Amino acid sequence: MALKTFKPTTPGRRQLVLVDRSELWKGKPEKSLTEGLRSKGGRNNTGRVTVRWRGGGHKRRYRIIDFKRNKFDVAATVERLEYDPNRTAFIALVSYADGEKAYIIAPQRLAVGDQVIASEKADIKPGNAMPLKNIPVGTIVHNVELKVGKGGQLARSAGTYVQLVGKDQGYAQLRLASGELRMVRGECMATIGAVSNPDQQNVSLGKAGRAVWMGRRPSVRGVAMNPIDHPHGGGEGRTSGGRHPVTPWGKPTKGKKTRSNKKTDRLIMRRRQTQ
């Protein structure tokens, strides 16, 4: 789908670039596959802010997505492609031959009326799901499991994909979008193709208000605060902060490594390339 630009009738319209969603379903979502979603405003169960810059925004309903793709050997027909406010990718409503319906993440080049299937061995075409051990080396995949049966976790965002670059001793070798090379069990499921809506990266919201509609509140820089509020705060006039960048709680940020899962370190063959 293409991008939409607008006549500069206001400053916000001048900068606005959106994805053209005119080809998507214009009705309501499948009611049996949705549930209520309450906005947390970045608060946890104690009511304290655990994620800053969240709050407000339009009310949403959660679409229940099938990330596991474990309904094997039953063909499904794509009924429609839909917008999902909870993610950047588009979703597809599929209807199985036995009457069951499900939402899946829509890959690129998937169209209404197409047939998709999850199986031990299936055709290499967008939307089909199978274990990594049965997918040819070099194939582009998305919605990849990290643990067998847990459901896809890798490459679910708009335009993303993972490339299968090798197989060795029961493991599949994957090249991620970050450049990281890692191993995943060959029994893990993956879906063929790249995720839909690759133009998402070119969207420009045009004004701060549109971000607020999405539940994103303003982000205040530490150097603009007072010393009581942030380690970078204070100083007469504009200052550079005077120390290496830290969070409001004094922990190093911007480049500080935060990964601490030694059990899976051996599965990472090459780390992602950082600046």
From Swiss-Prot:
An annotated GO cellular component: large ribosomal subunit
Name a Pfam family for this protein.
Answer: Ribosomal_L2
In alphabetical order, the GO MF annotations are: rRNA binding; structural constituent of ribosome; transferase activity
**What domain of life is recorded for the organism?**
Bacteria
SMART domains with a match to the protein in the record: Ribosomal_L2, Ribosomal_L2_C
Q: Which InterPro entries is this protein grouped with? A: NA-bd_OB-fold, Rib_uL2_dom2, Ribosomal_uL2, Ribosomal_uL2_bac/org-type, Ribosomal_uL2_C, Ribosomal_uL2_CS, Ribosomal_uL2_dom3, Ribosomal_uL2_RNA-bd_dom
Give the residue ranges for region: Disordered: 225-275
Tell me, which GO biological process terms does this entry list?
A: cytoplasmic translation
**Annotated PROSITE patterns:** RIBOSOMAL_L2
Keywords annotated in UniProt: Ribonucleoprotein, Ribosomal protein, RNA-binding, rRNA-binding
NCBIfam families cross-referenced by the UniProt entry: rplB_bact
To which protein family does this belong? Belongs to the universal ribosomal protein uL2 family.
According to its UniProt entry, the function of this protein is described as: One of the primary rRNA binding proteins. Required for association of the 30S and 50S subunits to form the 70S ribosome, for tRNA binding and peptide bond formation. It has been suggested to have peptidyltransferase activity; this is somewhat controversial. Makes several contacts with the 16S rRNA in the 70S ribosome.
How does the annotation summarize its subunit structure? Part of the 50S ribosomal subunit. Forms a bridge to the 30S subunit in the 70S ribosome.
Q: What is this protein called?
A: Large ribosomal subunit protein uL2
Ranked from the top, the taxonomy reads: Bacteria, Pseudomonadati, Pseudomonadota, Alphaproteobacteria, Rhodospirillales
Gene name in the database record:
rplB
